Structures are given as C-alpha cells and as structure tokens.
C-alpha cells in the first residue's frame, strides 16, 4: 500500500507505516510502500 511519505531508503518507512496502522514498508519510487496487517 503506497502512502504519501517520501523516502530515500526503506529504513525511513518503518515508522510511517506503523503510524498508518500497517506492518513494515520499503521505499519504492521515492515513496513508502507499506504491507497491510
């Protein structure tokens, strides 16, 4: 699930994904892509 959070590497997406109620994420096309629970 893409969220509107810009990133440079996947480590930056851990907290935004948790804040969005999802598990973890990776950085794709400079945006965070989270895995739903």
UniProtKB/Swiss-Prot annotation:
Assigned keywords, A-Z: Disulfide bond, Ion channel impairing toxin, Neurotoxin, Potassium channel impairing toxin, Secreted, Toxin
Entry keyword Disulfide bond: yes
Span list, region Interaction with Ca(2+)-activated K(+) channels: 25-32
Entry remark concerning the domains of this protein: Has the structural arrangement of an alpha-helix connected to antiparallel beta-sheets by disulfide bonds (CS-alpha/beta).
Family: Belongs to the short scorpion toxin superfamily. Potassium channel inhibitor family. Alpha-KTx 03 subfamily.
Known role: Binds and inhibits potassium channels. Intracerebroventricular injection into mice induces paralyzing symptoms followed by death. Its binding affinity to rat brain synaptosomes is 5-fold lower than this of KTX 1.
Name of the protein this chain belongs to: Potassium channel toxin alpha-KTx 3.9
Species in which this protein is naturally found: Buthus occitanus tunetanus (Common European scorpion)
């Amino acid at each position: 699930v893409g969220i509107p959070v810009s990133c440079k590497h996947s480590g930056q997406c851990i907290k935004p994904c948790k804040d969005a109620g999802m598990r973890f994420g990776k950085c794709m096309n400079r945006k965070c892509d989270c895995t739903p629970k």
